A protein has these predicted regions:
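Conserved phosphate-binding elements of NTP-dependent enzyme cores
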Residues: 1-824
């Protein structure tokens, strides 16, 4: 009986000829410090080989139309099933995607409204539910005798025939924002008070406006309401004006039609042909809910069918939990002959909905735009879609499924994983969360360190065996809850350095709130998924503080922000740095420019005639001509995926062989070239550059941030979310930050419990330099180390959106209403 996948000689990324067995039909966890090779083993070997072999069974013609993974660098992988991967960061969907379309729940709901609802005849009467709809027959109205075709499921889709004609199925319209048309009312119209006339229209519109009876030589605020109405909405009348050009002394008479300020913007919007033109216009626009469909995206005809007294638009506005209860009652309201069909449609809806509710997404409404969902919510949608089909014999590879999950939601996630195994599948997950790791039947730990010092299996076995293994780094964290490692402020001294006060109106699911955040402290915002953490901090506090510090108008829903002494807001999120391979750790950390100058001053460079600019791998003379300084070349192979290989000439160094002739006497006694330095990790380069003050200081900051394992030449787009966040912080360390607020969005993504301790040290150093640090987080180690906690909830969606408790970790633990408190 084959009971495990056998991997022999895996060399993907930093894996060092790894030989390991991965048990089938169980949950296998892969743990290890950041950069130790976990994802390389799970995604780079298991998923790459599992999906590639499945696709190779298809015809060449079919494969041509699919993106394919290249063959993994491994000697052999035996007994690997067809594989599906759920990536750490699902792509952000477009404007047309909603929670309903993304989960495909809307398909079942549209079918329900098409087949089971009461349909409206052309004269406005409703026909009782009938099987004639499913039989694709015309309906006859019992009141007026009109015959008509009922709408099919496709005619109820807002991305198809059921789209609202006004907003084209997006639920949003762009309208002119009157507040932007005259930004400074102290100016006269002659001085350019009406902004769109300055940028989108001929300057002579001022003369036409004068001919309309508006005084153009007094401050705009002093105009009468009638005059202002003419400026904003005046009629398109033709006026005879005397016009004098500003640039010359030429003058003349002409007839010209008046374009009011609003029409000027509308006219310019209609004529936009490119992005540049759109940029000129969009500053005068604001997005608003469509007045015709009320944001439901559906046409009047698509909103017409009635089931249990409501339309499709109203059903989509319910939360998933409410909607499930409503769907349960549908068959009972129909004639007996329709109930078997109704039960079948409703069951398909309930099966899909149950998975999503198990994963803690019951608070979301079907009409919620997918682009407003958090990473964790999108990942759980992806997981629910993958497990819905009750397949067997599939390998599911999950990359950090605990991202964005509150400890209380993890129970539902582990339940889904056990269901997959019960159906005869195998689950491999990469994670750091000890709560999830404890659910695994087998654990493989990678290490011992990160980067070049990692890539080996340092421990494997059951959870009990790992706990006893002296080589294991995760073992101690599986055994016991980790302790508090920083000195926390007491409740009495919490606000000694001052406070930031925020008041907001209702937005999304968040009710009107008033919160105080202590300055110079570590504040952690907690709460179950969907409780309003992101809305409170990223959509209210960040734009509110930014507006307050720059003297701009507060966003509409932000009622009040008081932040005395705060001058800058720094959002450190996990978005990748750069989009192309030309951005490296050395260029981003401002080390590369310094190194180029140093190498240009060497005797070798002077002899060969090289200047600092020549050492640039992007534009310099010394860049490799074969790969143009990227270090890789793409091979376009017909019928196969593009193959990206290290450049055969420079072997990935990005430099021509002449660059190796310029040597610098390093502090460790060796002579090294710039390509040699770029190939070193930060810790090694620190030793080599010990006598270069500026370079040493910048590299030391990166090492202190726990990034010593990254090589200087590593591409920044390939860094994990946690690495990207810490690299962005590098330029902020060491400065006085008493006027700064740092906001982190789940910074522990991808961090091992040991790395979380490094992160807490980083927070402490920022606080020691005077900064206020605010963190949105689910990680219990970070929560336990907070000075102040703002716990949102109590539930998600409509059941959340309020502040349940505020205070020290001890006060939150004692708060009966706090779900987070139960886990501290």
């Amino acid at each position: 009986m084959i009971d495990k996948i056998k991997i022999r000689g895996a060399r993907v990324h930093n894996l060092k000829n790894v030989n390991v067995g991965v048990p089938l039909n169980t949950i296998t966890a892969i743990a290890g410090v950041s950069g130790s090779g976990k994802s390389s083993l799970a995604l780079g070997v298991l998923y790459a080989e599992g999906s590639r072999r499945y696709l190779e069974a298809l015809s060449t013609y079919t494969r041509r139309r699919m993106t394919q993974a290249a063959k993994a660098q491994v000697d052999e992988v035996l007994y690997v099933p067809a594989a599906l991967a759920l990536h750490q960061r699902p792509g952000v969907p477009g404007i047309r995607s909603t929670f309903g379309t993304g989960t495909e729940l809307l398909n079942s709901l549209r079918l329900m409204f098409s087949r089971l609802a009461s349909h409206r005849c052309p004269n406005g009467h409703y026909v009782p539910p009938t099987l004639a709809v499913a039989a694709e027959q015309q309906l006859t109205c019992p009141e007026c005798g009109a015959r008509f075709w009922p709408p099919g499921a496709e005619e109820l889709a807002f991305n198809s025939q059921g789209a609202c004609r006004t907003c084209d199925g997006t639920g949003l319209v762009r309208n002119v924002d009157l507040a932007t048309l005259v930004p400074d009312e102290s100016l006269t119209i002659d001085e350019g008070a009406v902004a769109p006339w300055n940028t989108l229209m001929w300057s002579l519109m001022t003369d036409v406006c004068r001919a309309m009876g508006v005084r153009t030589n007094v401050p705009f605020r002093d105009l009468t309401p009638e005059e202002k109405e003419i400026v904003y909405h005046g009629p398109a009348e033709k006026k005879h004006i005397f016009y004098k050009a500003k640039s010359s002394n030429q003058a003349g008479e002409l007839d010209f039609t008046y374009y009011n300020a609003v029409y000027t913007v509308q006219n310019a919007l209609a004529k936009v042909k490119d992005e540049k033109g759109m940029k000129r216009v969009e500053k005068f626009l604001k997005q608003e809910t469509c007045p015709d469909c009320g944001g439901s995206r559906l046409s009047d005809a698509a909103r017409a069918p009635r089931l249990r007294g409501i339309g499709l638009d109203e059903a989509c506005r319910m939360t998933l939990t409410e909607l499930t209860g409503w769907v349960n009652g549908v068959p009972g309201t129909l004639p007996p002959e329709m109930r078997p069909m109704a039960a079948s449609i409703c069951e398909s809806f309930q099966t899909a909905a149950k998975r999503l509710m198990d994963l803690g997404l019951g608070y979301l409404t079907l009409d919620r735009a997918s682009s407003t969902l958090s990473t964790g919510e999108r990942q759980r949608m992806q997981l629910a879609r993958a497990v819905r089909n009750r397949t067997t014999g599939v390998l599911y590879v999950l990359d950090e499924p605990s991202i964005g999950l509150h400890p209380s939601n993890i129970v539902g996630l582990t339940g889904v994983m056990h269901d997959l195994v019960a159906d005869g599948n195998s689950v491999v997950l990469v994670d750091h969360d000890t709560q999830i790791l404890k659910e695994a039947g087998w654990l493989i730990e990678m290490g011992p360190e990160a980067g070049a010092k990692g890539g080996q299996v340092i421990a494997e076995g059951t959870i009990a065996e790992i706990m006893q293994n002296k080589n294991s780094k995760i073992g101690p964290f599986l055994k016991a809850e980790s302790s508090v490692i920083r000195k926390q402020a007491t409740a009495e001294e919490m606000f000694d350095a001052g406070r930031i006060h925020l008041e907001t109106g209702a937005i999304h699911t968040v009710k009107p709130l008033a919160v105080d955040i202590p300055k110079g402290r570590l504040t952690v915002v907690t709460g179950v998924s969907g409780s309003g953490k992101t809305t409170l901090i990223l959509e209210s506090l960040v734009p509110g503080l930014t507006a307050a510090t720059s003297g701009q108008k507060l966003p509409e829903h932000v009622l009040n922000v008081q932040a005395d002494g705060i001058r800058s807001v720094k959002l450190i999120d996990a978005t990748p740095i750069g989009i192309n391979v030309r951005s490296t750790v050395a260029t981003y950390a401002n080390v590369h420019d310094e190194l180029r100058k140093i190498f240009a001053r060497t005797e070798d460079a002077k002899t060969l005639g090289f200047k600092a600019g020549d050492f640039s791998y992007n534009t310099g003379k010394l860049r490799c001509p074969t790969c143009d300084g990227t270090g890789v070349i793409n091979l376009d192979v017909q019928f196969l995926p593009d193959v990206e290989i290290p450049c055969p000439d420079c072997r990935g160094s990005r430099y021509d062989k002449d660059a190796a002739k310029v040597k610098y006497p390093a502090a460790n006694g060796q002579y090294c070239s710039l390509p040699d330095l770029m190939d070193m990790d930060i810790s090694t380069a620190l030793t080599a550059c010990a006598d270069l003050k500026t370079v040493r200081q910048r590299l030391q900051v990166l090492k202190d941030l726990g990034l010593g394992y990254l090589t200087l030449g590593e591409e920044t787009p390939s860094l994990s979310g946690g690495e990207a966040q810490r690299l962005k912080l590098a330029s902020e360390m060491g400065k006085s930050q008493s006027d700064a607020v740092f906001i982190f969005d789940e910074p522990t993504i991808g961090l091992h419990p040991l790395d979380v301790r490094t992160l807490l040290d980083v927070f402490q150093r920022l606080i020691d330099s005077g900064a206020t640090v605010i963190v949105i987080e689910h990680d219990l180690d970070v929560i336990r180390n907070a000075d102040y906690i703002i716990d949102m909830g109590p539930g998600g969606g409509n059941k959340g959106g309020t502040v349940v408790a505020c205070g020290t970790p001890a006060q939150i633990k004692a708060a009966p209403a706090s779900v987070t408190g139960k886990f501290i």
